[in-house]
Swiss-Prot record:
Name of the protein: Chaperone protein HtpG
Source organism, top-level taxon: Bacteria
Region (A): 1-361
Entry keywords, A to Z: ATP-binding, Chaperone, Cytoplasm, Nucleotide-binding, Stress response
Cited SUPFAM superfamilies: ATPase domain of HSP90 chaperone/DNA topoisomerase II/histidine kinase, HSP90 C-terminal domain, Ribosomal protein S5 domain 2-like
GO molecular function: ATP binding; ATP hydrolysis activity; ATP-dependent protein folding chaperone; unfolded protein binding
Positions of the UniProt region annotated as B: 362-578
CDD domains: HATPase_Hsp90-like
HAMAP family xrefs: HSP90
Lineage, broadest ranks: Bacteria, Pseudomonadati, Pseudomonadota, Gammaproteobacteria, Alteromonadales
Organism, scientific name: Colwellia psychrerythraea (strain 34H / ATCC BAA-681)
GO CC terms in record: cytoplasm
Subunit annotation: Homodimer.
Region ranges (C): 579-653
Function per UniProt: Molecular chaperone. Has ATPase activity.
Length: 653
């Protein structure tokens, strides 16, 4: 290797420098994982070369024996991880080693809590990989050359992990990457072969690429003639000379792709470690399923559900998906075609015998084999979650708290599995009036009142707004359970999930209320009498609110509040209008239905008001109060306050 030249200084982005320092301190308690990360990256580089070489065999440069090598130098307190994989050119070095995360750093920082344990978990999900080297090293040197480039196109990258790094062009005869860790003084344990071997065996047995370490050198032994000790009369036999045995590179891992082994031969610990390899998550998975499918379409799948959600889970544009292998040859990361977007949290891999080795993302898009595998994997994940929900409610609740909002995308995206996805959903409800979303649609149906044929729900901006909605009053009075929905996605969900198990989902804020057999004859008779009594008042209110409401009705849903607004059956709900407006969509103008409570003292007072101006003022205040309760804001709050003040003053005279 020639001397480095053309040294250039670079700075990490400010957010990346912060992450680097935070990571070094937060992960210190489990620092040995740095070696797992570096070996995993080296194995990935070998996999990527194997794939590229399918179409260009010259990339092997007459060396097709792919491996990772781990070595140390006690005297200089260094540790080196080398691979003969794909390597990098200077642009790739700056892109991959100069940027800890290409996007999402602001969102990442917003989720940090200051608690070391939880922040450590989050950092693990962030996927720091290579940068974990700085946990034990005060300087890292990377020397790399991309396969196919000339020996003079090597690159050297050096950083002390303090916010900046240098790059220089070097000569590198062998392709691939060497990472040299200049260990901190108190981290010399990682310059010990036995310690390194124990870590590699612990974390990297499942990697299909051979991880090699040097054996100890055995010195030569000279020949010895037969000697008799006359004093003790003991004869020592002659011994031939033994040649020195040089240090040799030998595999220290099994180097067998874990997913190709029989399930019965794989321990839970091995499955957990393999999850960390494919996901770069530092925590254990919640669930996993390992299956070999034979028949018309043959493939092996190993699917994991994480315990914790990644910080950028709600970014639907971010690449997600499974690692794809064809006939055990790595093809690509993030093959999103095999898993629907609402299951983007699922990690793992697929190994297919029915796809071509030169498969591309474009070929995968409309491939019958892809569709069959996607269908099978989706059902497998849903079945895995269903089983967990039935078997361990507490564990499932933990899953729901992490991934529930993403799962709610399912009914809109996956029509074929809509009913099964709906069975996995959980909601808060008036059954407990708790913010905890632990009510399934099946358990709601089990508690339905005699004569009830609908699943009732309310959607609001917050749990408190949903729980205290005036639309719930008659339901609380009759003991009818209502689902309380306040997640941003809930309105979108119920627009696609209209029934479950033959029961229609019905919004309590939409259309006319018909409780059917749950209303007794006496209640219906009293309602009809009240409607006749208020017929002229309703007409007078409608005239007062001309152009602002579609209709005025005597309410059947109010018991404590004077008035409320509801959406007509065919109109957009308030929550859907807000959702569309928040993403810049044009929202059509629709008029609400205004319902009044004929038994309420305020409504009776308004009904008796003979002065037209005062009547109109009262009607406006009741209407704006109802709008405020339903939508959370008014177009002209100043006029509302002025009217309210005027009416309160009139009551003091």
């Amino acid at each position: 290797m020639s001397e480095t030249n053309q040294v250039q200084n670079h700075a990490f982005a400010s957010d990346n420098a912060k992450i680097l320092q935070l990571m070094i301190h937060s992960l210190y308690s489990n620092k040995e994982i740095f070696l797992r990360e570096l070996v995993s990256n080296a194995a990935d580089a070998a996999d990527k070369l194997r794939f590229k070489a399918l179409s260009d065999n010259t990339l092997y440069e007459n060396d097709g024996d792919l491996r990772v090598r781990v070595s140390c130098d006690k005297e200089n307190n260094t540790l080196t991880i080398s691979d003969n994989g794909i390597g990098m050119n200077v642009d790739e070095v700056i892109e991959h080693l100069g940027t800890i995360a290409k996007s999402g750093t602001a969102e990442f920082f917003s989720q940090l809590s200051g608690d070391q344990a939880s922040d450590s978990q989050l950092i693990g999900q962030f996927g720091v990989g290579f940068y974990s080297a700085f946990i034990v090293a005060d300087k890292v040197t990377v020397r790399t050359r991309k396969a196919g480039d000339s020996a003079t196109d090597g690159v050297e990258w050096i950083s002390a992990g303090e916010g900046e790094f240098t790059t220089a062009k070097i000569e590198k005869t062998n392709r691939g990457t060497d990472i040299i860790l200049h260990l901190k003084e108190d981290e010399s344990e990682y310059a010990d072969d036995w310690r390194l071997k124990s870590i590699v065996t612990k974390y990297s047995d499942h990697i299909s690429v051979s991880v090699e370490m040097l054996t100890a050198e055995v010195p030569a032994v000279e020949a010895v003639a037969e000697v008799t000790d006359e004093k003790d009369n003991v004869t020592r036999p002659a011994a031939d000379a033994v040649d020195a045995i040089p240090a040799l590179w030998e595999p220290v891992n099994k180097a067998t792709a874990l997913w190709t082994r029989e399930k019965a031969d794989i321990t839970d610990e091995e499955y957990k470690e393999f999850y960390k390899h494919v996901s770069h998550d530092f925590g254990d998975p919640l669930l996993w399923e390992h299956n070999r499918v034979e028949g018309k379409t043959e493939y092996t799948s190993l699917l994991y559900v994480p315990t914790k959600a990644p910080f950028d889970m709600y970014n639907r544009e971010k690449q997600h998906g499974l690692k794809l292998f064809v006939q055990r040859v790595f093809i690509m990361d993030d093959a999103e075609q095999f898993m629907p977007t609402y299951l983007r949290f699922v990690k793992g891999l697929l190994d297919s015998n029915d796809l071509p080795l030169n498969v591309s993302r474009e070929i995968l898009q409309d491939n019958k084999v892809t569709q069959a595998i996607r269908k099978g994997c989706t059902k497998r994940v849903l079945k895995m979650l269903e089983k967990l929900g039935n078997k361990d409610a507490d564990k499932y609740q933990g899953f729901w708290d992490e991934f529930g909002q993403v799962l709610k995308e399912g009914p809109a995206e996956d029509h074929a599995n809509k009913e099964q996805v709906a069975g996995l959903l959980r909601f808060a409800s008036t059954h407990e009036d708790s913010t905890t979303q632990n009510v399934s649609l099946a358990s709601y149906i089990e508690r339905m009142k005699e004569g009830q044929d609908k699943i009732y729900f309310v959607v609001a901006d917050s749990f408190e707004a949903a729980k205290n909605s005036p639309h719930l009053e008659v339901f609380r009075k009759k003991g009818i359970e209502v689902l309380l929905m306040s997640d941003r996605i809930d309105e979108w969900l119920v627009s696609h999930l209209t029934e479950f198990d033959g029961k229609q989902l019905q919004s309590v804020t939409r259309g006319g209320l018909d409780l059917g057999d749950m209303d007794d004859a006496e209640t219906k008779e009293a309602q009809e009498k009240l409607e006749k009594e208020y017929d002229s008042v309703v007409k007078r209110i409608k005239a007062s609110l001309d152009g602002k409401v579609k209709e005025v009705k005597l309410s059947q849903r109010l018991t404590d509040s004077p008035a409320c607004i509801v959406a007509d059956d065919d109109d957009m709900s308030s929550q859907m209008a807000k959702l569309m407006a928040s993403v810049g969509q044009e929202v059509p103008d629709t008029l609400p239905i205004f319902e009044i409570n004929g038994e309420h003292a305020l409504v009776k007072h308004v009904a008796d008001e003979q002065d037209d101006d005062m009547f109109n003022q009262w009607v406006e205040v009741l209407f704006e109060q109802a709008m405020l309760a339903e939508r959370g804001s008014l177009k002209d709050p100043a006029s509302f306050v002025s009217r309210l003040n005027k009416l309160m003053l009139s009551l003091t005279k």
